[in-house]
């Protein structure tokens, strides 16, 4: 395709792999770049050629002709050179250029910034969480109120999300807060921070309004015409003849809006302080914003320009102590533009700002910086000038304006880019896996159920460490999606050699993979099989729930059916000796009945017999049939009675605990205080996170960086009814804090897919925006059920014996959904740590991807609290959709390594190089349970014992840790405590310098 010659000046073709072809785009004027020679003369330099390079380092062949609204220089990576962010309107992509220090620019790598605003209006920079890294904020036009959103249309084109695609940079109609990770990449955290929606926003500025040491955010809003008004668009669309542009604009209402002040409360959390600070008290069309100290009191005031109205000056009345800084630079840079100023006060985090000129939307601020000092007398100011030299002022007085002259600067100072000096605990060893990539064939979930919030066809894979060939080294086994094959990556002491299962590619997804001893020796791999993509209920009933892959001579044989087909597709599997006969029994968790989400599905327990078969357990069938839609499951002895209890994570329900009384299960969720913590839980594991000898529960959910929010008093609800052939009717609802009514969260066009008469009943988008759930459902309102979530936080449930206490994991861990979760002592300090596998991309088409995670390592403090490791501290960066995660010491060095699977992308391996070496425990169990599944281990040091660890098969989101357990080994360790399934205990002495110990169960 090509544009006809007559139109090439107005239009261009853009290649869009995400749309499977090319699109026509309107051209704007090209952006202009001018170099100052220092003598008052500027020379235009084309934004192409050798000075401007693309992400791969190739020169731009043509100058960008995007609809640019703002451009701003700021040194984002601390190398002393000004980088450049260019804000582009409509669907033109923003351009983020890094300066090479020689005046050349290169676009940031594709994966450095995963999501941006769609119609970017302005940009500003600040270190919002005071971690010494520069964060980036851009504005767009998403309304903060549900009612306004429901009567407007979106400006961005909803794009299909391809399986495994991570390198594209999606654009979404919302503000973006790019939170710097410190490794040259950013995590989009606007929802997480509470800054995603400020209305039709133009200028924005970071400024510490209340002088508490954290920069707050001011955003100005409004537009002459609300051209996103859906009713206006419909009126124009129904007109038979063309409408002149000036009359067309008259179809749209004026959009006057209040400007917004967002107070930075720390920890990447902003709250609306507009009313408290008397900012934006009236509705107007405000576009420009600038900062200056108009009254000389050392606090920055604000000037806002408005369309068709006089400008407004807001006087800052904060009385908190501060210092103001102006710079006198060497000619010709007399204002010291590009210099970085840092203020350190004893009771506040270090504050840094760069002296900049212009760059706001059609605006620029005065060259004065203001910093909080609290009541400290110890205040230092340092300036790193553009040429690298430094000026230092020690123990300055508060409440003063300091003008600092470059003439007194000292020799060149190092760049200020913050670095974590500690060596990362992990290094990337993925290359050892031979390039294994998870395969997941595309499936259109939304044809069958149009109102699904997320795809259910891209939930895998799980990953397990299993010694498949019996050579003493644990191998990696990864599930597959339809069209792929079960992957066995054999550990050959230095690299992993892939072995493929025999037969054709899998017809259905293989979920959890677990080992059981085969009759006559060897291993059988049990694989959960999902029938979710079956074309009909009848077809689903021909899909075996569990397959068995016998392993012969290191190679897997053809699969055989282990468990009969069921109506529900399978997700999690878990193994334990539930009835005390010495054989491992199998729990099969129901994920969903195809086409009926979120209706519950029955799970099942299969007992193993002495001849190696699995038979359905009837004693617990009724109890297991009502557990709901299970995302994950594991067995663990929570009460220390020697019998494995069952813990399950469900969608739209609590984490449930079923107590095992000699093979009979009883749901004790309510008794343990867990019933009120409902969520769309994903993964779960257990670990002794406070070192008290009791296993705690860790459950992953969707985090705090999505459009969803929930609390006990305002749950996020799903109203469910029966809509016939297209599955259950779904209405996502939440109580509106303003009206007190339960309001639908879905836009009218989407909800109308399931309620055909809704358009007629509503009559207009404006009317629909005011309708409650009962009004939307009409006569069907009484024939519905409600399920809900009270939290979306990843949560630690501390075991107190007769109850569990809920504690949200650190806020930094909530920046993305998590699935896989591993509890292990990664640093070897004797305190259990956690790892979370993060991200979820296959949301419904109009919802952004949830991909701000990179895999989160949490170092345990030993009391149930954690330190969230940065990417530099952990060494882990997994930017795709993490699913299963499992730990093992694959190279036998006494450190816990990590394997993480990704949906539709490469399986990753992380080698632990910095943890303290621990004790490797090899259990030799009975014939029916050779790995000792269910055994608990603790290190004994005099009268003290370390955290308890249990050998388990299943959990961690469809996964299994290695059975060779690594325990931290303190210098005074004397013995290993082992409690086998059913409660028999052993104390095994540890010799000085011993690093491996073998414990054999009594025969």
Feature roles, as predicted:
Residues 185, 252-462, 496, 525, ...:
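Gly/Ser/Thr/Pro-enriched helix-cap/hinge segments flanking short amphipathic alpha-helices
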Residues 35, 68-76, 98, 120-130, ...:
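Beta-propeller blade termini
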């Amino acid at each position: 395709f090509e544009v006809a010659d007559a139109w090439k000046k107005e239009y261009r073709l853009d290649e869009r792999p995400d749309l499977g072809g090319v699109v026509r785009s309107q051209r704007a004027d090209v952006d202009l770049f001018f170099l100052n020679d220092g003598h008052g003369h500027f020379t235009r330099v084309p934004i192409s050629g050798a000075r401007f390079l693309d992400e791969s380092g190739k020169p731009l062949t043509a100058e960008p002709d995007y609809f640019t609204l703002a451009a701003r220089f700021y040194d984002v990576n601390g190398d002393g050179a000004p980088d450049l962010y260019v804000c582009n309107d409509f669907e033109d992509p923003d351009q983020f250029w890094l300066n090479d220090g020689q005046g050349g620019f290169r676009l940031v790598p594709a994966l450095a910034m995963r999501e941006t605003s769609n119609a970017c209006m302005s940009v500003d920079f600040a270190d919002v969480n005071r971690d010494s890294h520069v964060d980036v904020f851009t504005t767009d036009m998403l309304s903060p109120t549900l009612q306004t959103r429901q009567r407007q249309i979106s400006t961005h084109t909803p794009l299909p999300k391809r399986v495994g695609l991570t390198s594209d940079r999606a654009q979404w109609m919302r503000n973006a807060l790019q939170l710097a990770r410190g490794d040259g990449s950013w995590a989009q955290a606007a929802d997480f921070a509470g800054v995603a929606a400020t209305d039709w926003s133009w200028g924005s500025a970071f400024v510490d309004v209340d002088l508490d040491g954290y920069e707050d955010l001011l955003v100005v809003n409004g537009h002459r015409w609300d051209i996103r008004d859906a009713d206006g668009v419909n009126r124009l669309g129904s007109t038979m003849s063309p409408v002149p542009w000036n009359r067309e604009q008259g179809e749209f209402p004026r959009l006057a809006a209040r400007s917004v002040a967002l107070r930075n409360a720390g920890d990447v959390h902003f709250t609306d302080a507009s009313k408290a600070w008397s900012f934006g008290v009236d509705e107007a069309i405000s576009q420009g914003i600038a900062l200056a100290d108009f009254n000389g009191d050392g606090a920055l005031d604000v000037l806002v320009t408005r369309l068709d109205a006089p400008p407004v000056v807001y006087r800052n009345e904060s009385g908190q102590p501060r210092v103001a800084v102006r710079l006198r630079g060497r000619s010709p840079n007399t204002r010291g533009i590009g210099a970085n100023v840092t203020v350190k006060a004893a009771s506040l985090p270090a504050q840094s700002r760069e002296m900049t000129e212009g760059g706001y939307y059609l605006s620029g601020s005065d060259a004065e910086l203001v910093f909080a000092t609290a009541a400290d007398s110890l205040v230092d100011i340092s300036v790193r000038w553009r040429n690298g030299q430094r000026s230092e002022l020690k123990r300055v007085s508060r409440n003063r304006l300091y003008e600092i002259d470059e003439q007194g600067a000292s020799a060149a100072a190092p760049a200020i880019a913050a670095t974590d000096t500690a060596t990362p605990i992990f290094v990337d060893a993925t290359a050892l896996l031979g390039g294994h990539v998870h395969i997941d064939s595309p499936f259109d979930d939304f044809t069958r159920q149009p109102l699904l919030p997320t795809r259910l066809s891209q939930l895998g894979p799980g990953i397990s460490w299993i010694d498949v060939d019996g050579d003493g080294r644990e191998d990696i086994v990864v599930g597959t999606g339809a069209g792929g094959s079960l992957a066995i990556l054999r550990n050959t002491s230095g690299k992993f050699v892939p072995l493929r299962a025999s037969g054709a590619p899998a017809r259905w997804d293989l979920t959890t993979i677990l080992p059981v001893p085969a009759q006559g020796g060897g291993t059988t791999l049990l694989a959960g099989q999902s029938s979710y993509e079956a074309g009909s209920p009848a077809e689903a009933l021909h899909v075996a729930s569990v397959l068995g892959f016998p392993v012969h001579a290191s190679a897997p044989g053809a699969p055989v059916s282990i468990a009969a087909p069921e109506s529900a597709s399978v997700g999690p599997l878990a193994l334990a000796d539930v009835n005390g006969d010495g054989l491992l029994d199998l729990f099969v968790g129901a994920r969903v009945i195809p086409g009926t989400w979120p209706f519950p599905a029955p799970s099942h327990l299969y007992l193993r017999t002495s001849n190696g078969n699995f038979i359905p357990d009837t004693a617990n069938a009724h109890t297991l049939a009502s557990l709901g839609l299970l995302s994950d499951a594991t067995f663990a002895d929570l009460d220390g009675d020697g019998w494995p209890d069952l813990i399950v994570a469900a969608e739209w329900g609590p984490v449930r605990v079923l107590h095992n009384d000699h093979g009979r299960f009883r749901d004790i969720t309510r008794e343990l205080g867990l019933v009120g913590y409902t969520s769309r839980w994903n993964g779960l594991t257990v670990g002794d996170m406070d070192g008290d000898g009791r296993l705690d529960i860790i459950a992953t959910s969707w985090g705090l960086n999505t459009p969803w929010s929930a609390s006990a008093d305002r749950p996020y609800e799903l109203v469910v009814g029966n809509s016939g052939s297209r599955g259950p009717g779904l209405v996502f609802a939440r109580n509106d804090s303003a009206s007190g009514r339960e309001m639908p969260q879905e836009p009218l066009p989407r909800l109308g897919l399931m309620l055909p008469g809704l358009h007629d009943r509503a009559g207009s988008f404006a009317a629909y925006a005011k309708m409650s759930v009962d009004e939307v459902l009409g006569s069907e309102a009484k024939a519905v059920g409600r399920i809900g979530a009270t939290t979306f936080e990843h949560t630690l449930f501390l075991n107190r014996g007769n109850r569990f206490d809920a504690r949200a994991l650190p806020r930094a861990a909530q920046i993305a959904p998590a699935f896989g979760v591993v509890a292990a002592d990664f640093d070897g300090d004797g305190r259990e740590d956690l790892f979370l596998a993060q991200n979820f991309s296959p949301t419904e088409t109009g919802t952004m991807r949830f991909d701000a995670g990179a895999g989160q390592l949490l170092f345990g403090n030993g009391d149930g609290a954690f330190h969230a490791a940065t990417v530099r501290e952990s060494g882990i960066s997994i930017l795709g959709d993490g699913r299963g995660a499992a730990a093992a010491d694959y190279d036998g060095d006494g450190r816990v390594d990590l394997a993480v699977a990704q949906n539709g992308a490469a399986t990753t391996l992380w080698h632990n190089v910095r943890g303290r070496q621990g004790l490797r425990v090899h259990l030799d169990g009975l014939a029916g349970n050779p790995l000792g599944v269910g055994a608990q281990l603790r290190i004994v040091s005099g009268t003290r014992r370390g955290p308890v660890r249990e050998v388990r098969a299943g959990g961690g989101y469809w996964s299994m840790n290695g059975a060779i357990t690594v325990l931290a080994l303190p210098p005074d360790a004397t013995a290993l405590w082992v409690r086998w399934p059913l409660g028999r205990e052993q104390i095994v002495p540890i010799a000085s310098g011993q690093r491996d110990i073998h414990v054999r169960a009594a025969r």
